[in-house]
């Protein structure tokens, strides 16, 4: 696969295709060139050159050198491009570090992210079958601790992409480039929708960023995405309570854009602060919460009432729920293999229906273009997933 721009969105998941991540060598000595599974990586501002595009399963060592002028990161991603198998952060210019992982056969991606925020550079990578056993290790407590670390990495990556996209969106909107702002709106919001349960844990951040007009209380100031959404897709009087919509002034636009960026930065600051954690029960509850978001807001078409970009949010909520489940999947499979099998299939079924409508990368049509039968089918698939997902928390906590 040719190298392409990539917006990383991922969790350091405990996957069936991953046995364990060996701690990174902080000194960064390179692996011997004739060792099995030894690869070199050169990261620059516009390239991520890996010495091979495949390796045998087992222990892999990526010796990563930053040949660019900015701090970089290196990732090994799972086959969906949304889950980080393992990563190295904060590789300074001229520095080399090793990423050592144990990987089972399968399709992966390698990725460098110069600057550590926003887009990155990826390439397909294949792990062939060496015949070596690669399986889960550690007791349940260790697996849950690793899952929590995994999910925090996923959240940090998502909010990094979110702040970069939000800044670009806000700049376009404040400058009056409505066409560009509309183009960026849904694609940027997916990073928010994937990790919204984390924002909700910080109290006032969720309403500051994602409050719908229909949920405003008397005297409450309206800020965030949906204020700007309405201004970009201005409603006719019959869709605005019979009143003619009054567009925001240039000054009001600038204030709304600045507020959106500032509140998003607050989220970034919270999740990148020392000591930020998200426990296993919160991850599991968050997976169910994201499906509830779909059932109450996306299936009904009420979330994006002006732009009708609900399918983007729908997909992002499902992405977030799936990643939350998958970081816990090994524990679920051990505790209740039937539940794990059921969840695996229900996610496949729902995502197949969404794939028929488009993708985050390629875009979706307006939610209002769906037929009643299609909406009903999506709602049924959400319900079918929601029931087994409601048992996730009790399964991983042993309640």
Mark where each language-model region is.
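C-terminal motif of bacterial Sec signal peptides marking the signal peptidase cleavage site
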Residues: 16-20
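Bacterial N-terminal signal peptides that target proteins for export
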Residues: 1-10
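Short, low-complexity, disordered segments immediately C-terminal to signal peptides
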Residues: 21-42
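Beta-strand signatures of extracellular beta-sandwich domains
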Residues: 73-77
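Beta-strand cores of secreted/periplasmic/IMS beta-sandwich domains, seen most often
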Residues: 51-70, 97-112
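Extracellular/periplasmic metallocenter environments
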Residues: 25, 40, 92-134
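Mature extracytoplasmic or organellar-lumen-exposed domains after removal of signal/transit peptides
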Residues: 135-399
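Surface-exposed loop/edge segments in extracytoplasmic proteins
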Residues: 81-88
């Amino acid at each position: 696969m040719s190298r392409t721009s990539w917006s990383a969105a991922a969790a350091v998941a405990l996957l069936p295709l991953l046995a364990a991540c060996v701690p990174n060598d902080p000194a960064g000595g390179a692996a011997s060139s004739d060792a099995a599974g030894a690869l070199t990586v050169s990261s620059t501002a516009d390239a991520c050159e890996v010495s091979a595009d495949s390796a045998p399963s087992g222990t892999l060592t990526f010796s990563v050198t930053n040949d660019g002028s900015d701090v970089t990161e290196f990732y090994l991603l799972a086959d969906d491009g949304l889950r980080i198998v393992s990563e190295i952060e904060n590789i300074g210019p001229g520095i080399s570090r090793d990423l050592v992982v144990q990987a089972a056969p399968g399709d992966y991606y390698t990725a460098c992210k110069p600057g550590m925020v926003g887009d990155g550079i990826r390439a397909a990578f294949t792990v062939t079958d060496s015949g070596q056993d690669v399986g889960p290790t550690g007791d349940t407590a260790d697996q849950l601790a690793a899952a929590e670390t995994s999910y925090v990495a996923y959240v940090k990556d998502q909010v990094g992409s979110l702040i970069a996209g939000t800044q670009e969106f806000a700049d376009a909107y404040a400058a009056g480039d409505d066409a560009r702002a509309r183009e960026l709106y849904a694609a940027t919001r997916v990073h928010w929708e994937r990790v919204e349960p984390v924002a909700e844990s910080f109290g006032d951040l969720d309403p500051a960023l994602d409050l719908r007009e229909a949920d405003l209380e008397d005297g409450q100031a309206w800020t965030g995405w949906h204020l700007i959404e309405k201004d970009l897709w201005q409603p006719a009087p019959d869709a605005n309570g019979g009143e003619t919509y009054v567009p925001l002034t240039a000054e009001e636009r600038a204030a709304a854009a600045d507020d959106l960026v500032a509140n998003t930065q607050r989220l970034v600051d919270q999740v990148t602060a020392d000591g930020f954690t998200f426990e296993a029960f919160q991850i599991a509850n968050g997976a169910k919460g994201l499906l509830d978001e779909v059932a109450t807001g996306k299936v009904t078409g009420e979330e994006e009432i002006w732009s009708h970009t609900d399918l983007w949010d729908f997909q992002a909520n499902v992405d977030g729920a799936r990643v939350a489940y998958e970081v816990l999947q090994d524990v679920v499979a051990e505790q209740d293999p039937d539940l794990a099998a059921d969840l695996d299939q229900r996610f496949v079924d729902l995502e197949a229906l969404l794939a028929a409508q488009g993708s985050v990368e390629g875009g979706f049509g307006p939610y209002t273009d769906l037929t009643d039968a299609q909406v009903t089918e999506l709602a049924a698939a959400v319900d079918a997933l929601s029931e087994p997902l409601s048992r996730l928390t009790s399964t991983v906590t042993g309640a």
